[in-house]
């Protein structure tokens, strides 16, 4: 280490070196506020948070809903989540690249949101006598939509920022995802108890429609910031 520090020359150009950030700039809440307030990506960042708030809300009560509405045990509930895992792996592991090349991230985000909305509405409207086919179809649709939305929306934010701003923005997106995932389940649980078993699904679908509106009104062109 001493040899490296004393003998090896600095190769990073002086003009490209960054000034160390101030302590207040490292505050995660300040970074989140800055990203949401950025006109280039603010709507998309807010959409990212609202998406995970809604999605993690109604998915958190799925097992309870399956038990109370369809009298499902662990086996059928596990099968439903297994379908989610398989479909999500196929979409994100093999299909997302060709689909982005053909449709672009913006259209894929809207398509994915439409699929998630459809899946979230199909679950509470499924006839108990057709529960297996209805629910398994619904969760496959949900997984397909989520597999499209998450990488596409993240890429939309990244492409609208300069290289210097991408790291902080993507870190803020991760924080927004965690915050939505943290707040969604308890909110859905309260709605489940106070407003009825289907309220998290219909409420989540309504929130996702707002997300779709925000994304659809975001600029299509890339904007460096």
Residue ranges and their predicted role:
Residues 60-77:
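Short amphipathic helix-loop junctions that connect adjacent transmembrane helices
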Residues 190-208:
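A membrane-interface helix-boundary motif in multi-pass transporters
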Residues 9-46:
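Juxtamembrane intracellular "pre-TM" segments in multi-pass secondary transporters
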Residues 114-129:
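C-terminal ends and interior cores of transmembrane alpha-helices
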Residues 91-105, 192:
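Helix-to-loop junctions at the C-terminal end of transmembrane segments
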Residues 165-193:
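A late C-terminal transmembrane helix in Major Facilitator Superfamily
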Residues 148-161:
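Intracellular juxtamembrane helix-capping segments at the cytosolic ends
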Residues 1-16, 214-218:
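C-terminal membrane-cytosol helix-exit motif in multi-pass small-molecule transporters
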């Amino acid at each position: 280490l001493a040899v490296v520090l004393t003998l090896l020359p600095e190769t990073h150009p002086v003009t490209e070196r960054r000034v160390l950030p101030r302590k207040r700039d490292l505050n995660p809440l300040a970074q989140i506020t800055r990203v949401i307030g950025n006109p280039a990506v603010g709507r998309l960042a807010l959409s990212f948070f609202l998406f995970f708030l809604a999605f993690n809300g109604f998915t958190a009560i799925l097992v309870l809903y399956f038990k109370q509405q369809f009298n499902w045990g662990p086996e059928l509930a596990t099968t439903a989540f297994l379908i989610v895992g398989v479909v999500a792996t196929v979409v994100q592991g093999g299909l997302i690249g060709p689909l982005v090349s053909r449709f672009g991230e913006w259209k894929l985000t809207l398509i994915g949101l439409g699929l998630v909305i459809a899946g979230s509405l199909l679950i509470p409207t499924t006839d108990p006598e057709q529960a297996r086919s209805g629910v398994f179809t619904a969760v496959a649709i949900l997984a397909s939509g989520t597999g499209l939305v998450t990488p596409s929306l993240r890429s939309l934010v990244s492409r609208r920022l300069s290289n210097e701003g991408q790291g902080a923005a993507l870190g803020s997106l991760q924080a927004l995802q965690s915050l939505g995932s943290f707040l969604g389940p308890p909110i859905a649980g309260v709605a489940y108890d106070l407003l009825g078993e289907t309220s998290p699904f219909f409420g989540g679908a309504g929130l996702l429609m707002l997300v779709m509106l925000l994304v659809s009104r975001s600029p299509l062109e890339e904007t460096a910031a």
